[in-house]
């Protein structure tokens, strides 16, 4: 039976000094011997998804203490991708995932904590904490800050649902007046919480439900709704129970690596494909699997993407549908329930709150439960009042959306599309694969041939798009923006948003070794692997080359002969794999350290150290 890790610092004559320091934090004689639970918070006033978390760590801490544990809170960093976007700040976003994972590992191992509650929300914070949980393999429960309410605005007599992406697209559209842009900007992000569509933050918080590491509703319950408080309260009690089950009863089924095994990762990826999650989730799922030693890779994602249909379309794929609508339709447990009916989910994986995922679905799927509590929970609605305060409203929908034929969440028999929401493409331009969010691609361009317009950076691409260098039928190629080449693998939301604003959203394609915001839609293909900086063929594309994209057949190819590609490769090897012209980019020592060990996107952009 494993001993509590914390005994290392709380027991024995030689630990008198450590106990003295513990006492200085408020611990008493009666606390030594209780499980010490790390409350891993990520409060910051920089990020709307985290601005309301300040007091929530202490809410969880009090519940831990009431359940018989000792709670010790600390904070991680949190980068807002939307604020960091469009300038060199975006170079820091993906590397911050590793800093977060490292900081959690450092704090938990340095102080010998027994278990942890991870309070996350936005783009790299949930993945960073997930990586840490898989590394540490101690009992862990995830509880996020929740999604923000969708913006609502009346424009020219019509009520429109808004989010962050609408503000960006409107700002670049010359046909929209300055006054309308201001109205959209002021209404797009009305409350605290993670941005309201199926963007990266919400996608990842939904996936923790499928992995079995968070409570039902974690991904969809609004940050402002009073129902969300229950998740924090329950997390505090639950983690003490999990710690006792492991350390006192030798129950390894409560450990992250047991819960999030390969079958659980397949469940999570199936959910991701069905709900049309952000392409960034592929990076983060691959990274978490790597950290936990789980044999799950691009070939598994490719296999699943060929059989899992798209059951839900949420902004940016469907602009009038947001996370509050997903919640009303039953949230993630409903999507998992529909997948389970189709034989596309493994019911036998463990969760932190039920014996198995199948048990959780039976209890929490609104189309099969008899629980009025569950039905009321999923009626939680937006309050419609701008606020930065958590749990500040208790509005409810009059009814639930259970329409499996035409509602927000569809059945396997009547999906939005038989093809899932994400796909892996292979070809001579991406031998190790690349990713496209098919849920956001118009059916008319699922097959696309176009001429390459090549840019050596996102900045150059933005300038070119706004300068009308790109026309209908083109394929924009943005390279040297991968994990090493950027460094940091910037998101390309501005180029895709500007293509939309120029009326080219359904007339062009974009391929990059960088990545995309969860807010991106259109024929946007990212994560081209190997990246240009590692000798990937995306670095061999030349202006005017024909590129052929075939999503139904999962291929992407540069229509150049093998002999010509070999000649270009030999020439590039002599020059070195770097942009043709120097870029005005401040690459600091911290970023260089990340780039030195970063792998390509097909490996999750994790750091791989030489043997």
From Swiss-Prot:
Where does the sequence pass through the membrane?
A: none
Q: List the Gene Ontology MF annotations in alphabetical order.
A: 2 iron, 2 sulfur cluster binding; dihydroxy-acid dehydratase activity; magnesium ion binding
The enzyme class is: lyase
Cofactor dependency: [2Fe-2S] cluster; Mg(2+)
The pathway is: Amino-acid biosynthesis; L-isoleucine biosynthesis; L-isoleucine from 2-oxobutanoate: step 3/4; Amino-acid biosynthesis; L-valine biosynthesis; L-valine from pyruvate: step 3/4
Question: Looking at the Swiss-Prot or TrEMBL record, what is one Pfam family this protein matches?
Answer: ILV_EDD_C
Known catalysed reaction(s)? (2R)-2,3-dihydroxy-3-methylbutanoate = 3-methyl-2-oxobutanoate + H2O; (2R,3R)-2,3-dihydroxy-3-methylpentanoate = (S)-3-methyl-2-oxopentanoate + H2O
**Gene Ontology, cellular component aspect:** cytosol
Q: Which residues carry this modification: N6-carboxylysine?
A: 124
What is this enzyme's EC?
Answer: 4.2.1.9
Q: Which GO terms describe its biological process?
A: isoleucine biosynthetic process; L-valine biosynthetic process
InterPro entries in the record, alphabetically?
A: Dihydro-acid_dehy_C (IPR042096), DihydroxyA_deHydtase (IPR004404), DiOHA_6PGluconate_deHydtase_CS (IPR020558), ILV_EDD_C (IPR056740), ILV_EDD_N (IPR000581), IlvD/EDD_N (IPR037237)
Position of the signal peptide = none
Q: Where does Mg(2+) bind?
A: 81, 123-124, 491
Q: Which residues are responsible for catalysis?
A: 517
| Keyword entries, A-Z | 2Fe-2S, Amino-acid biosynthesis, Branched-chain amino acid biosynthesis, Iron, Iron-sulfur, Lyase, Magnesium, Metal-binding
The record's remark on the cofactor is:
Binds 1 [2Fe-2S] cluster per subunit. This cluster acts as a Lewis acid cofactor.
- Where along this sequence does the record place binding of [2Fe-2S] cluster? 122, 195
Quaternary structure annotation from Swiss-Prot or TrEMBL: Homodimer.
User: What family does the database annotate?
Assistant: Belongs to the IlvD/Edd family.
**What task does this protein carry out?**
Functions in the biosynthesis of branched-chain amino acids. Catalyzes the dehydration of (2R,3R)-2,3-dihydroxy-3-methylpentanoate (2,3-dihydroxy-3-methylvalerate) into 2-oxo-3-methylpentanoate (2-oxo-3-methylvalerate) and of (2R)-2,3-dihydroxy-3-methylbutanoate (2,3-dihydroxyisovalerate) into 2-oxo-3-methylbutanoate (2-oxoisovalerate), the penultimate precursor to L-isoleucine and L-valine, respectively.
The protein's name is Dihydroxy-acid dehydratase
Q: Which gene encodes it?
A: ilvD
């Amino acid at each position: 039976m494993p001993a509590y890790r914390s005994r290392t610092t709380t027991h024995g004559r030689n630990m008198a000094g450590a106990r003295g320091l513990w006492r200085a934090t408020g611990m008493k004689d009666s606390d030594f011997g209780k499980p010490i639970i790390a409350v891993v918070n990520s409060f910051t006033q920089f990020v709307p998804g985290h601005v309301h978390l300040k007091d929530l760590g202490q809410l969880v801490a009090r519940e831990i203490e009431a359940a018989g544990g000792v709670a010790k809170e600390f904070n991680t960093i949190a980068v807002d991708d939307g604020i960091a976007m469009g300038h060199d700040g975006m170079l820091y976003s993906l590397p911050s995932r590793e800093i977060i994972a490292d900081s959690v590992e450092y704090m938990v191992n340095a102080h010998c904590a027994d278990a942890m509650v991870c309070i996350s929300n936005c783009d790299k914070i949930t993945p960073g904490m997930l990586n840490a949980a898989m590394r540490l393999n101690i009992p862990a429960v995830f509880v996020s800050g929740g999604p923000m309410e969708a913006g609502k605005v009346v424009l020219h007599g019509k009520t429109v649902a808004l989010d962050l992406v609408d503000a960006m697209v409107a700002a670049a559209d010359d046909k929209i007046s300055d006054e309308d842009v201001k109205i959209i900007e002021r209404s797009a992000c009305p409350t605290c919480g993670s941005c309201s569509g199926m963007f990266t933050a919400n996608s990842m918080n939904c996936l923790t439900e499928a992995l079995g590491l968070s409570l039902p509703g974690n991904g969809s319950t609004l940050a402002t709704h009073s129902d969300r408080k229950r998740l924090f309260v329950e997390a505090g009690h639950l983690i003490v129970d999990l710690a006792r089950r492991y350390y006192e009863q030798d129950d390894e089924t409560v450990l992250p690596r047991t819960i999030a095994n390969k079958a659980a990762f397949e469940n999570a990826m199936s959910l991701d494909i069905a709900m049309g999650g952000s392409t960034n989730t592929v990076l983060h799922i691959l990274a978490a699997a790597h950290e936990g030693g789980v044999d799950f890779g691009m070939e598994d994602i490719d296999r699943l993407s060929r059989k899992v249909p798209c059951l839900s379309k949420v902004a940016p794929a469907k602009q009038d549908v947001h996370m509050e609508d997903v919640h009303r339709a039953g949230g993630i447990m409903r999507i998992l329930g529909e997948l389970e009916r189709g034989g596309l989910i493994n019911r036998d994986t463990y969760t932190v709150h039920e014996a198995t995922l199948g048990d959780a679905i039976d209890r929490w799927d609104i189309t099969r439960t008899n629980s009025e509590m569950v039905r009321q929970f999923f009626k939680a609605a937006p309050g419609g009042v701008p606020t930065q305060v958590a749990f500040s409203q208790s509005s409810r929908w009059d009814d639930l959306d259970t329409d499996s034929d035409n509602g927000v969440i569809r059945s396997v028999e009547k999906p939005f599309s038989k093809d899932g929401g994400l796909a892996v493409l292979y070809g001579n331009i991406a031998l190790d694969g690349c990713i496209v969010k098919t849920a956001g691609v118009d059916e008319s361009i699922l097959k696309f041939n176009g001429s390459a317009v090549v840019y050596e950076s996102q900045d150059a691409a933005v300038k070119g798009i706004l300068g009308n260098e790109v026309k209908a039928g083109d394929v924009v190629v943005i390279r040297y923006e991968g994990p090493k080449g950027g460094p940091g693998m910037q998101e390309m939301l501005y180029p895709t948003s500007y293509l939309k604003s120029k009326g080219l959203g359904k007339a062009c394609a974009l391929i990059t070794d960088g990545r995309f915001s969860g807010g991106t839609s259109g024929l946007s293909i990212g994560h081209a692997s190997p990246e240009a900086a590692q000798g990937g063929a995306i670095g061999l594309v030349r202006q005017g080359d024909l590129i052929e994209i075939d999503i139904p057949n999962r291929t992407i190819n540069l229509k150049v002969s093998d002999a010509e590609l070999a000649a270009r490769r030999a020439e590039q090897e002599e020059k070195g794999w770097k942009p043709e012209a120097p870029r005005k980019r401040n690459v600091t020592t911290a970023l260089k350290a990340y780039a030195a060990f970063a792998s390509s996107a097909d490996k999750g952009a994790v750091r791989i150290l030489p043997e």
